[in-house]
Amino acid sequence: MDKIIKTISENGSFRAYVLDSTETVRTAQEKHQTQASSTVALGRTLIASQILAANEKGQTKITVKVLGTSSLGAIITVADTEGNVKGYVQNPGVDIKKTATGEVLVGPFVGQGEFLVITDYGTGNPYNSMTPLISGEIGEDLAFYLTESQQTPSAVGLNVLLDENDKVKVAGGFLVQVLPGAKEAEIARFEKRIQEMPAISRLLESDDHIEALLAAIYGNEPYKRLSEEEIRFQCDCNKERFMNALATLPKADLEEMRDQDQGAEIVCQFCQTAYHFDQNDLEELIRDKS
């Protein structure tokens, strides 16, 4: 079971979220059949969305779009406050060579572009905010977004580690944010600790990477665990939603599908579930337009 643990320093100056997103990213890889670089890039973006959604309340949905310039294309993920996240990469079969040490490159793979966040509070007026991709590594781009767009100094670490067969071995990350009222000396102390943290990949390889992340973030600083919440890859698509989408097509197009194709098939981009609509389904839509 994947989870996010929310914590706060005992003096109330900082909050930290740590995540185990291994099954989330593994499910995404299985559904989309992504190559190594695509898996890591999509996985990091899924984790980034989980972090942003964890900061929200109510029935809020967070859409993250990584709009890079490379052949990978766009990465689009959607997370909600119930712990669900879904996502896809435009070109999952694109890959680049690993480094000599076996590291999967993401920054050069994503390229330059924009980091777009759409916050939907369910009011019909979603809020859009965009910052440039500063590295394409996703974690650094999220930290820059939070600092620039939300005016909240933040440190972010997230990664996806693959095994020798390029299957997801472990995935997770952390967010540390300064809270109002933090003193300069406290900020400096935490900044130093974050700078001296082991690489996120090393921490994720620990037997208990959640505890390893918390220990690296807080050191000897006392902190409180506020909550532990389940997170998962879960798409909310259904046949009715795609039926409604078909209903928006011109009558002539529906008749062509009925007569020439004997039906229609729509595949959800987010989870690759295929929905089949037979001639009777199409006939129903055609009658509604008569």
From Swiss-Prot:
CDD domains with a match to the protein in the record: Hsp33
Q: Which gene encodes it?
A: hslO
Asked if the Swiss-Prot or TrEMBL record annotates the protein with the keyword Disulfide bond, the reply is yes
* Localization: Cytoplasm
Modification after translation is described as: Under oxidizing conditions two disulfide bonds are formed involving the reactive cysteines. Under reducing conditions zinc is bound to the reactive cysteines and the protein is inactive.
First-listed, main subcellular location of the protein, grouped into a coarse class: cytoplasm
GO cellular component terms, semicolon-separated:
cytoplasm
Query: Which of UniProt's keywords are assigned here?
Result: Chaperone, Cytoplasm, Disulfide bond, Redox-active center, Zinc
**Disulphide bond pairs:** 235-237, 268-271
User: What's the family?
Assistant: Belongs to the HSP33 family.
Q: What does this protein do?
A: Redox regulated molecular chaperone. Protects both thermally unfolding and oxidatively damaged proteins from irreversible aggregation. Plays an important role in the bacterial defense system toward oxidative stress.
Q: What is this protein called?
A: 33 kDa chaperonin
Species of provenance: Streptococcus sanguinis (strain SK36)
